[in-house]
Amino acid sequence: LMQKGSSGAALLAIDGTVIGIHVGKFGVSIVAQTLPNSTKWSDILYAKKVEDYVKKRTDIFVPISKMENQSESIFSLNLSHYPKELQDRLTDFTVYDDHEYSKKYLDGLNAVKIGNIPQVKFRPRGTLVVDGELVELCENNAIEDGEYGITVGNLDVIYKDARKYATPQREDYDEELLIKAIKFVRKQFSFLYGTPFVPPEIVLRRIRRQTSPGGLWTLLCSTKGQVIEKYAPMLYKYMKDILEGKPIPTIMVSSAWKEELRLLEKILDGKVRTMVPVPIEVVCSFQMVFGNMMDIISNHDFRITKMAVGFSPYFGGWDALEHSFDGFDKYVETDISKYDSHVRNNIKTLMFNHFWSTFFVTPYEETIAWNVYSSLYHVQFLLPDGNVLYFPDGGRWSGEPLTACENSLINYVLFVYACHKQGFSDEYILNDTQCIFMGDDARCGFRRETTFSFDSWMDAYEQCGFPVGETQKKFLERFDVSFCSLKTLPRQYLGRYVFVPIDTKMLSSLR
């Protein structure tokens, strides 16, 4: 059954499940999820059952007797895994260009200034573009917040954003209690045990339709598909070398501003976001090791995983998400500022040791997984002016394949950690709370007259190095609470109430 909702979005009813589908310029989206362009409903609604997916690993790779760890210096420029035309084009690091922006935002902080690659410099553009057509489009879609503009970054924005990775943060958490929280979350994901690696040739098929190739590849190609067309054998060899236990070359990530539609008042306040895309070889290695796990999580029932990553319509989408909060009396929401930059290496190590590593069947697989996982601990951070930095504490880079999954998992862990710190049992967490996480966003419901302290939860974030800032600090009514900036609107459809998101804030769908 297909018909239009009042917003113009298609409402598709299958076996009593109602799903809102928005078709925009850049593809098809279900609620907040963007899927690749497609004309087949079977592709849009594709989801696999994973209950029977857990199977014993068949070892198709030759075991390696001795594993080597990454040993290259962060202060050298290794281009051995890049094409010869790029190697000939670039020289090694020269003296770091310590200009006004670098001194203003990085001096005295935990950032090592490595050097400069003059060949990657490009001229910064302006700071603000107001597009009249987009303003009109917003007005036509009943967005009443005023004028909008397209954000365009500059060096000031870039260095200000880099500063967050160099800022020391509070870390006085109870490690034993945090590990206990990770193990609690791990139990909910036992279905991941025995998940096999993805063969290299399948990896290249999966990522072919993705966009920026990241890192130094942007000097040669504009999309991952172009890199694969020209240099697939190099990428294939890169993955096979990893499977043979060879050291992973030092990785270079590149910082760039993100052009997007934002409220004019936010742009004028300097709220312009940046991205740090990882190079295509990193996407390949992580997809090879963790790709199947990420697929399983994305297609699993979010009432078990507590994660809206992928948000498979197989489990009912937004309507089912809202119904999962039926019977709860108090609600809270969080949205942690600059979340990615505060996911430091020590937290990631705990996550690998007590979560990811437990799902690999053989020591060989676990070692390969650790080599890939830790390859992003010590990266070279390339800025648009050619300067290269190193942040000893690490961080989360926006283009990491694991970002959505692991950030959501860490958010879940921090909630459980806060519950344990307040003396709540595992049974209380399972039976008297309901949560949903998507990256840094969280929405939680509590049953009955709970004594759960929101301030204590926020202090748990602070202890683990996540500054809370202006996060909401009180209980809310059911339809006042939001998730990923979306609030819920109950609507009648075919004689019953259907919960849909109020999507006037979903500006990305307008472009």
What are these model-predicted stretches?
Residues 26-27:
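A short acidic/small-residue loop/turn micro-motif
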Residues 2-23:
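Catalytic nucleophile loop of clan PA
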Residues 35-511:
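Viral RNA-dependent RNA polymerase
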Residues 19-20, 30-34:
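Active-site scaffold segments
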